Amino acid sequence: MALSRAKPDELPRDAVVITEDQALKYQWKIITSWDKIGEVWSLRYTPGILSALAAGTGAYINNHYRTKLRLGGHGRLSTYLPIVAVPAIFTMLAHKFFIQRPILLNPLGECPVCIQMRSAAFQTSLGIVYPTILAPFAAFLFATRCYTYRIPSITENPREVFLLWRKFTRPIVPALGTLIGLQALLTMFLTGQEDKQNFKLMLRMREIEHQVEEEHLPQRMDF
């Protein structure tokens, strides 16, 4: 059965009213059990793809600062968890809740470009900007604690700390700009595919429902 949204006074008498959570669960049941993966691949795999991109970017940024500050094996887990794992998890959750949920529950209820832009903003913020801000702080902290690199005191010489941060960050600025552009474009493309495939899935469900209704209608008899 295809889902549809309507006002209470517009509901047919035999309509089954369900909550948004129930509707979302029903939609996911259809998507995961759909026999043609090519028709629903973006809905299934986009959160995982975006999560992997965020994890890869976080690992790249974290490794850059760790290498510059000669950390070696010091604090490896303590930096990878917040800079690699957390962005990956938050990126997936943000996409599922703020992007996929509106697409599945209210198709055509919002401007497609607006959804794509919002999705790209979440991806670049959580997957690139957040690790870029956190990674140098974590690396500086462990470098000071483990004595792997001489870090000026941030309270006594904040300007020197800033210059050191700029020195280490400048080499990866072009790469970060490229990553932001590529991830934004890929995220917008995948989100557009989600919107398109969900709409086609809804039309297909209505078509199947119409066929079933026709098959169960009593045969017309002409005299």
Curated annotation (Swiss-Prot):
This is Transmembrane protein 126. Belongs to the TMEM126 family. GO terms for biological process: mitochondrial respiratory chain complex I assembly. It is found in: Mitochondrion membrane. Residues 1-39, 100-123, 193-223 are mitochondrial matrix. PANTHER family: TRANSMEMBRANE PROTEIN 126A (PTHR16296:SF2), UNCHARACTERIZED HYPOTHALAMUS PROTEIN HT007 (PTHR16296). GO terms for cellular component: mitochondrial membrane; mitochondrion. It is a multi-pass membrane protein. InterPro entries: TMEM126 (IPR009801). Pfam families: TMEM126. As part of the MCIA complex, involved in the assembly of the mitochondrial complex I. Keywords: Membrane, Mitochondrion, Transmembrane, Transmembrane helix. Residues 63-78, 145-171 are mitochondrial intermembrane.
